[in-house]
Amino acid sequence: LGHGQAQATEAGQTIAQSADYFPDTVGTRWQYRGQISEGPLQTIENKYFFNVSSVTGTRTLKGGVVVNVFHDTNPGNHGASDSFYRRDAAGVVYYGSEPGTPLEKQLVPYQIIRFPMKVAQSFQQFNRMDIDFGSDIDGDGTNEHVDVEGVSTVIGQESITVPAGTYPDAVRVEARMTLKIHLSSADRTAVGTDVMTAWFAKGVGLVKYIERQELAALKEDRGNTTDITEELEEVTVKSAPALQGRSESSPERLLADDTRDHELFQVLFAPGLRPYTR
């Protein structure tokens, strides 16, 4: 709701001051309201939630890698989590979250955005074959294995309206994850997809995302679809230290919510089959 037509931005055109769309100074805070609709097509259930995301500091991971820490109180209505990111001149790398999923732990670290942003630019974030899915979908007591690919695309710039206001030149990014789940009890594959469309405003960060997660029907069930939306209500952006400067290589954050998912690339499945994604 509230997003207009993509502006006339040519493919390959660089979006000026890309870093300014992803403020991540410690103390910056975003408040979102969210909605989830889930279930087979015939039985959709709606839930509402709130999430506050804030930049809390840095952490040194094993191996000496220093990452930024983003704390979310309830992203995607899944309880509190911390997410870890590192930025350099090439872009932003995601190092996972706490708590994270077994699947995510096998994928990180991976790049979530490239600098500078360019319209219609896509890149493959990960492509892993035959890894542990971390869940037993078919109920035979054995975790399934999965082939998983993630691709990110900068769609362009357009106007977006949310409770916090209207942002006329927001950057729209689409992240698509595709899973081919190999069922251990039968010689067949279940297909899952997670598509997140997110809008970022200059000087503000994430203002909205829409995420659709789908799992094809298994056996006699009707499959499962989950739609998650978060919209910005309030934001407080702290200024960067004067000595830090601002450039294409300055700190950027792809999603202030977490995935979500990475958070950005997690799939929610039917009740009882759902990895903890946030």
Where is each model-derived feature located?
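Conserved functional acidic sites
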Residues: 9-278
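Signal peptide processing junction and immediate N-terminal pro/mature segment
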Residues: 1-10
